[in-house]
């Protein structure tokens, strides 16, 4: 039993002294000396203003590029995983790009099926029953045979989410999910991420560990359980929302609308 308990408490992500470079400009550093641990079942929001390197941080966390310095482990395996032999570990993590980043020459159905076709070598007919439940759950069914260019940004983001979920990841990284969304779609995302965190039916009720980036903390106050900030090339772990609100500071004013910041000040 002790051995099983140790496995359950092993971090899913761990960084020591990590420096992150820019994906588009490798010579530029966006964050330095990151020390961070993510446990199974965590729900993190990493906040920062536009241009602070949130997307680069998430791309590095998702093993799409190596850290400039430092060490990083995913499920105990050193990152990044570029070799084919350790790809299985990498596929336990899903990544949702800002905007969805679908292929416009493929239909929505074909975009979502890509991980199954490529990583599991499934044929079109074999993949279909595995993607249809996600089309339904994400309300994409009416546009399944359309191309991404035929639908709005609100829906394109969901295509990227469905594509990341078809392989049933244990960890999901989501870049700026609420950016550019109207209130209805933003509310849907918040509720759906809550369902993933609790354990979605399509994932056999297994909770997913979440790391989300955001430029506005307000929508996440009652949702996420852990918060961190990227500011001036520094990654700072803030803790729970109660700890964030108690700390206050200039950075909080930057990442909250004025009325939300006033409302969430701790009572003195």
Q: Which ranges hold each PLM region?
A:
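Helix-to-loop junction immediately C-terminal to a conserved catalytic motif
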Residues: 62
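ABC ATPase NBD coupling module
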Residues: 79-94, 244-247
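Q-loop/switch helix immediately C-terminal to the Walker
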Residues: 99, 106-118
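Conserved ABC ATPase "signature" region
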Residues: 125-143
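Conserved ABC ATPase signature
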Residues: 147-151
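Conserved catalytic motifs of ABC-family nucleotide-binding domains
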Residues: 168
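Conserved beta-strand-loop-alpha-helix hinge in the C-terminal portion
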Residues: 234-257
């Amino acid at each position: 039993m002790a051995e099983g308990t140790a496995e359950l408490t092993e971090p899913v992500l761990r960084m020591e002294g990590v420096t992150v470079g820019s994906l588009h400009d490798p010579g530029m550093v966006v964050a330095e000396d990151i020390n961070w641990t993510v446990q199974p079942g965590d729900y993190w929001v990493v906040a920062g203003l536009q241009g602070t390197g949130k997307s680069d941080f998430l791309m590095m966390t998702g093993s799409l590029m190596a850290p400039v310095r430092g060490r990083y482990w995913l499920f105990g395996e050193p990152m990044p995983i570029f070799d084919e032999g350790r790809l299985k570990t990498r596929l336990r993590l899903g990544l949702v790009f800002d905007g969805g980043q679908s292929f416009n020459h493929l239909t929505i159905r074909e975009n979502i099926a890509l991980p199954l076709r490529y990583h599991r070598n499934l044929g079109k007919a074999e993949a279909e029953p595995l993607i249809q439940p996600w089309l339904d759950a994400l309300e994409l069914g009416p546009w399944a045979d359309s191309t991404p260019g035929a639908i709005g940004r609100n829906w394109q983001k969901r295509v990227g989410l469905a594509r990341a979920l078809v392989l049933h990841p244990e960890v999901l990284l989501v870049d700026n999910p609420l950016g550019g969304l109207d209130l209805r779609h933003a509310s849907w995302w918040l509720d759906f991420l809550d369902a993933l965190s609790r354990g979605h039916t399509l994932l056999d009720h297994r909770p997913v560990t979440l790391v989300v980036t955001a430029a506005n903390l307000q929508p996440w106050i009652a949702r996420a359980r852990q918060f961190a900030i990227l500011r001036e090339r520094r990654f700072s772990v803030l803790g729970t929302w109660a700890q964030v609100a108690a700390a206050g500071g200039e950075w909080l004013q930057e990442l909250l609308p004025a009325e939300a910041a006033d409302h969430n000040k701790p009572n003195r």
